[in-house]
Amino acid sequence: MSSENTAIIPIVMPKWGLSMTEGTLNEWLVEVGDTIEVGQAIMDVETDKIASMVEAPDAGLLRRKVAEEGELYDVKALLGVLADDLVSEEEIDAYIEQFESTVGDEEEEVEEALRSQYIELSTGTIRYVHRDGEGTPLLFIHGFGGDLDNWLFNLEVSANPVYALDLPGHGQSTKALNGDPIECLSQTISEFVSAKNISQCHLVGHSMGGLLAAKFAIENPSLAVSLTLLSPAGLTSKINEDYLVKFSEADSRKAMKTTVSLLFADQSLVNRSMVDDLLKYKRLDGVEEALHTLREAMSNNGQQTINLVEQLQNLVLPITVIWGQQDQIVPFTPEVEDLSLGTHIRIELLPDVGHMPQMEAVDKVNEVLKQLS
């Protein structure tokens, strides 16, 4: 951006995840003349992966909408302008004319830093991403049927080093699970941490990944600095086994969309591209068997087979549990409140959020992640 007018703040097309290069502005949620607050939903954007509301990173008066609804724009393209009343229309016109997309070198550096990499472990070939930073690293662990792209809204918010990986049976990693499936995934995490010479880390886990993060911390207390668990397995008795079965067996767009919609309180987040990507993943050799094996290891007649509550209560490190009140996969139940008996454990129950708080409550989750040092 070449303009030096600091009284003008641009609203740009956000970048979510490694592969996003453009997005469609579906709808403006604010009007010219509105005073925008930080965190306020200002527009709805759709990519080839997901549709989501965009929250304002800056506060100010919306003076101009540059982008039109229904149009496709490059990442970092100028969509709107915030400026106070003292800024003239002529200054805004000049700013818009001079604005330069910041995709360029800065964006290339980010993409380079977060490009997919691969490492050979005893459990197979593992895909991961890494970004340098200052402080204790954050290690992100996805859930059942997911991959590291589930963290597309969260990987770049912390100034700390960041790692995220595709577990065996998922994403672009090896599909075979050797031996006990949960132990195979646990071993993968342990070997990855060792291979990357990570002496300590903040563990961030979602669903099955929350169970794995907690298990790692329990078994390696000297390596874990904190736990951030999103809709985690392993803390309650119930699990939606019907979802696990249907996800494992879905082989059509209709079946997959119906199933995946259960993940979200706002089902409009599920778009055609998301469904197509999941079906492509499901059709890879070894995936169906891996999911079936994991499903059987985690659940039995709608009951979870692993419960780590007592061990977490005895663990001496900060634990934040974030749960969607509308979670239909691992529903929040009163028994979770037993966790709060430990003074080191904080529980955040979010209204109007389903099983994917990292996508449905981005601001809240990222606020927690930014506090990790």
Task: Pin down the residues of each PLM region.
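Short alpha-helix in the alpha/beta-hydrolase fold that links the catalytic acid
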Residues: 308, 331-339
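Short beta-strand/loop motif that positions the catalytic acidic residue
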Residues: 315, 321-323, 327
